[in-house]
């Protein structure tokens, strides 16, 4: 016990003697079983409770893929932890793995190499003053991972002491990490890819990514919030293109089963002869072409959620088998006798009126009531008012990033055009319209002539012209150019006329043709 005083630094305001029992327990596990999970559990508990660490992480280095993967952590949400994948030499963690040397950042705010890859700092009000310690997990001269910690230090000596403590913890952990990497070399790379995919999917399907603040959409958000923490079966109703899959994903990725699979199946995408095999799987030799055992979508979704889109397109035969799964959570593969039990959530969606289908005998009544436990109806885009402009701006911003095209806005007259259109294809149609217009735009603005003919409406004051005729199209362009000039020059007719290459008198005549008033633009 001669080393005890080294860690009893009570003059620093914190004592480190209480880490010794846990350190001893870690070393015993490392010697007797080498169970990495148990060792890391103690390690993280020690950091959190006895070292007052705000966020702690253990990463593992997969030499084959070159990835450094966040293996375990605390202080991070599942979405943040999912982003914890680094390359050799990338950021502080990547540099520690590359050099095998510990790195201490006294103040995160002042260190440009600190990537904040997980995005966790965005939540904290005083996180700019946090310190960051990262030490390598070494076995001989080989780096196998890192241990890192974030916390607020007001004492440089205590910071130095904790670097030493973490280095001892890393040494104690090293043998178990080495064994784990040898036994799970393929799983580490797979874990990195799974984390990346879960993070990407979680971001895509979080409720914040369902665009819209109209009253009908606020009601949808309230229903999602009500059902998200349960395992209740959900039936999502709405026209094609309204975003039923986004709502299903938002429910799954914010539920207790978020770490489980989210399996999607379109019931209208395959012929009746193969749907049963796709959903429930099949045994080897169960039919011509069944050359091996295959798991179905329900087995793949075990522990998570299965999303059955276009459920109204199922045949009555398949409906009967789906009803059994909903009632008993069990089924048999095609050609098999073994009953398979699954624990999962079912979310179904349709653009059909299932109640009418029940009445005319094309949809099973029992199945309808099993699915219709918690219905969520997504309104069509034409009923969402201001959401049309919000969505259009969102798509402009997204496609600008994805395509590398500099488009700043949609012209004012065309915003009116977007709002007056009925959008039979809903959000999907709007997305396609904006993507097309982005490709056609040349001056950073989406004009009316960039939109498809189906959106072109007759111009005010030109009701005699056919809506698809040349005069109407030219009038639409002229109307838009005048409105843009008036808006740009805040209703100053002289400046607007100069901008358009007209006299103020001619501009006034053209404005009269379209019932435009310069005062509306001041």
Curated annotation (Swiss-Prot):
Pfam families: GAF, HTH_8, Sigma54_activat. It comes from the Bacteria. Residues 22-183 are annotated as: A domain. Keywords: Activator, ATP-binding, DNA-binding, Nitrogen fixation, Nucleotide-binding, Transcription, Transcription regulation, Two-component regulatory system. ATP binds at residues 238-245, 301-310. Residues 210-439 form the Sigma-54 factor interaction domain. One of its GO terms (biological process) is phosphorelay signal transduction system. GO terms for molecular function: ATP binding; ATP hydrolysis activity; identical protein binding; sequence-specific DNA binding. The keyword Amino-acid biosynthesis does not apply. Residues 493-512 bind DNA. InterPro entries: AAA+_ATPase, GAF, GAF-like_dom_sf, Homeodomain-like_sf, HTH_Fis, P-loop_NTPase, Sigma_54_int, Sigma_54_int_dom_ATP-bd_1. Residues 35-177 form the GAF domain. Required for the expression of the V-dependent nitrogen fixation system in Azotobacter vinelandii. It is required for the regulation of nitrogenase 2 transcription. Interacts with sigma-54. This is Nitrogen fixation protein VnfA.
């Amino acid at each position: 016990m001669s080393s005890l005083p080294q860690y009893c630094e009570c003059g620093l305001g914190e004592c480190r003697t209480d880490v010794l029992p846990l350190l001893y327990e870690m070393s015993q596990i490392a010697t007797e079983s080498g169970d990495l999970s148990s060792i890391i559990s103690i390690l993280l508990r020690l950091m959190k409770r006895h070292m007052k660490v705000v966020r702690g992480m253990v990463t593992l280095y997969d030499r084959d893929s070159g990835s450094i993967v966040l293996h375990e952590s605390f202080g991070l949400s599942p979405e943040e932890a999912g982003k914890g994948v680094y390359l050799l030499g990338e950021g502080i963690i990547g540099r520690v793995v590359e050099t095998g040397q510990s790195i201490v950042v006294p103040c995160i705010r002042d260190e440009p190499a600190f990537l904040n890859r997980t995005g966790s700092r965005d939540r904290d009000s005083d996180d700019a003053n946090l310190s960051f310690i990262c030490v390598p997990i070494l076995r001989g001269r080989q780096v196998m991972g890192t241990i890192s910690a974030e916390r607020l230090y007001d004492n440089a000596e205590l910071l130095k002491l904790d670097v030493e403590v973490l280095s001892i913890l890393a040494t104690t952990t090293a043998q178990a990490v080495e064994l784990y990497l040898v036994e799970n070399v393929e799983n580490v790379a797979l874990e990195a890819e799974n984390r990346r995919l879960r993070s990407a999917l979680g971001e895509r399907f979080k409720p914040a990514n369902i665009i819209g603040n109209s009253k009908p959409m606020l009601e949808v958000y309230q229903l999602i919030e009500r059902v998200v923490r349960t395992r209740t079966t959900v039936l999502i109703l709405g026209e094609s293109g309204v975003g039923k899959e986004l709502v299903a994903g938002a429910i799954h990725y914010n539920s207790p089963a978020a770490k489980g699979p989210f399996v999607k199946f379109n019931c209208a995408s395959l012929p009746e002869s193969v749907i049963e095999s796709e959903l429930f799987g099949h045994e080897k030799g169960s039919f011509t072409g069944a050359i091996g055992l295959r798991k179905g979508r329900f087995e793949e979704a075990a522990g998570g959620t299965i999303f059955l889109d276009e459920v109204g397109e199922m045949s009555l035969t398949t409906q009967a088998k789906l009803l059994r799964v909903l009632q008993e959570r069990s089924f048999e593969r095609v050609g098999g006798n073994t009953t398979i039990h699954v624990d999962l959530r079912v979310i179904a969606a349709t653009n059909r009126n299932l109640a009418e289908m029940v009445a005319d005998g094309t949809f099973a009544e029992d199945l309808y009531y099993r699915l219709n436990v918690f219905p969520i109806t997504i309104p069509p885009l034409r009923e969402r008012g201001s959401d049309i402009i919000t969505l259009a701006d969102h798509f402009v911003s997204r496609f600008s990033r994805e395509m590398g095209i500099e488009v700043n806005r949609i012209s004012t007259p065309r915003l009116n055009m977007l709002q007056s259109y009925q959008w039979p294809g809903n959000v999907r149609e709007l997305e396609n319209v904006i993507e097309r217009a982005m490709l056609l735009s040349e001056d950073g603005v989406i004009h009316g002539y960039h939109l498809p003919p189906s959106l072109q409406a007759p111009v005010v004051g030109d009701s005699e012209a056919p809506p698809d005729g040349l005069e109407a199209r030219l009038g639409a362009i002229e109307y838009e150019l005048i409105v843009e000039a008036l808006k740009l020059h805040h209703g100053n007719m002289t400046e607007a006329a100069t901008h358009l290459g007209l006299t103020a008198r001619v501009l006034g005549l053209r404005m009269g043709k379209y019932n435009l008033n310069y005062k509306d633009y001041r």
